[in-house]
Each structure stands twice: as C-alpha cells, then as structure tokens.
Amino acid sequence: MDWSCSHPETAAPDPNLLPDITVGVAIEPRPYQLRIISKTVRMFTGEYVNRHGEQEPPANSVMIESPTGSGKTVMGLSVARRMQRQFGYSVGWVAMRRNLLTQAEEENRRRGFDVDMKLISMFDKTPPQVDLLVVDEAQHDGAMSMANLHCMIRPQKVLGLSATPYRTDRIKLCFDKVITDAGIHQLIQDGYLSRYRHFTIPEYTPEAVARFYTAEPQRWGKTLIFFHRLEECHACQRLLNDAGRHAEVVTAKSNRDQQLDDFVAGRVNVLINMAILTEGFDCPSLKTVFCRPSGKSCTIQMGGRVFRKHPELPLKQIVQCKKTPHPFIKTAMADEQYVWVDGAWRTLKLNQAINAITQNARRVIAQSQVALPKVVAANRAHPMPWERDR
C-alpha cells in the first residue's frame, strides 16, 4: 500500500504558522489549510524558515498541491487576501474553464474574503496586468497557453493550485516551490473527505458497466463513468438509455454547463466521459465513480471526484476492474470492499478489522509523546514528510 504519509494533526506547532491569517473571514480553517496558507505567504514574503532554521529568500512562484475537496479555493483566496491587504497587490484568478472562475468568484463573495480580483480565462488574448496571478488547476502550467499568458501578464508572484500536478518536471520549471501536506487517505481518516466503499468487477467494457448499473441503479445513485474511447462512451450511453436510465456523454463539444446542471438537479442519472470531468467538476451529491483501468495518476484524478462530503451520503463508492493497474485502495483504504464473484457481491470482512486496528493505533499515537534522541535529531539526513518542501 502507498497510503501517503502526511502531516499528522498531532504534530508539534509549525514555526511558520500565521494563526490570524483567516480572521474576519467566514471559515474555520482546518489545521492543514492553516499550515499551507501560512507557509505560502511566508515563502512569498521571504519569511519562510526551513527545517534547518534558515530563512529563505522570497519565492516568485509557489504551487499548492492538495487533493480534490481539500479546499484549494479557500486556501488560494486566503493567500490572495493577505497579499492584497499587506502589500496592495492586484490579483488575477485564471483557469481554463469558466465554472472554475465562477466557483472562485462565489467563494470570494460568500465567505467574505472580499478580494478585489480579475477573472481571467487562460485563453484571453489581452489579459489584465496583475501583481499576483492565481492559477487554478495548475497542472496545465506546462501548456503553451499558460506560458504565453505568463509572458503577457508578467506578474510579480504566481500561486498555483492543483490536486495532481503530474507533469512533475514541467511543474518544477514553472514554480519555485511546491507545497504538499495531507493526502487523500489522511484527509479521509481526519473526517475532511468522505469515506468510501470499493467495488471490483471482472471486466470493464461498456456492456459490463451498463449491466452492473442497470441491475442496481439505487445502489449506485448519481454516477460518473470514465472510458478510454469516445465510442465506448456512446455505446454505454445507448445501453443505459435503452434501459430507461438517462445518461449523457460529456465532451469538449457538448453543452457541458447544461449537462452538469441537469446532473446536479437529478434530471440526468449518469455522466459518461473520457477525461474532461477529471478536473473542475464538483458535485457533493455524486455517489459513485466507475474508473476505467488506468495508472496511479489518472486513477486518483477520476476517483478524486467522489470524495466531497454530503450529509445524506456517508459512504461514497468507487468501482474498478480487477485488472486495473492501480486499485484505489492503494491510495486510500476503503471502509468496505466488495468483489463480484459467481454472480453476487462478496464482501471482504477483513477491512473492518483493519480499520478498527488502524483507528486504535491512531488514538494511541495521538496520545503519545515521542522525541528523537538528540544525536539522531542533530544528524537526521532526511526531513519528516510534513517538513518537506520542494
């Protein structure tokens, strides 16, 4: 298992913490959010103290890497608010998709951040000049369109927000610093993301997926389905529609805004796509994601859509094929696991025992005080996971 080890909530206080940074805003910052916001501001201002006790020079660009549902928009607005109030920075918020800009604008108003900011499309021909450019879904920063935008705006500071910056080499070229903190598994355990069930099916074809969905539509609820090819998407759509389940295929050319509105309103039961909904799609009432067989990066992008919490859905669901290269349980442990065997779902009871042991261990660890021997601490070659910054 590769459950990411991340900053535990029981760790010692961070010397870079700015506890008053969200005062006056209608949010109660989560501990990891406060750490990330504080570290970002201090990196921009040249006040960041690294693990060696050295104060680092100001960074021109910082990227926040944090899972879907962890509140990246809130963190970005918090940083922008501080930089604008303290230094008078003009702020621009840029994204590839209009819905991301709309979400940022609504959060800014609703939460009382009151950041005076320009909303910028990544494809703007004449973008406004700003001092701080916030780049939503910053994994696109390696793309030529974003590089051109940088050249036109020439901001003093750039803040990137991303759940999964896979183009690691390109990202490192675009950002001076990359901040990581809590991963999906940790955020689920701490109650910030939804817990989930994991289902394994024998094969992943349009026919198989449609068959499983139509057999138990109430089990799956609002569902997002991913396929590799467009013809697979349309094949699955036809099968679902023939069975009386309203499904839509979302593409770059379809009326995506209307499709998403219909899905949220319950007029559409299922959305099918190749990859376009791996980003910028936020729907807490989404219950199930069918993830096509893929590697780790793409699997996390697809599955990550389902972890936003909803009061009526205590357990979300991820469905994968047994041949997938990266089962999601390698990223985050599921509360329950089911496998389709001999025409029925078989539960893996061991999961509940593992979860009980894990929770007990977490309680014991949280109540323990551990200190490294002075000699070991003085000569430690590698930082702890929560001390890392790149």
Residue ranges and their predicted role:
Residues 68, 73-108, 229-231:
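Conserved Walker A/P-loop ATP-binding site and its immediately adjacent core
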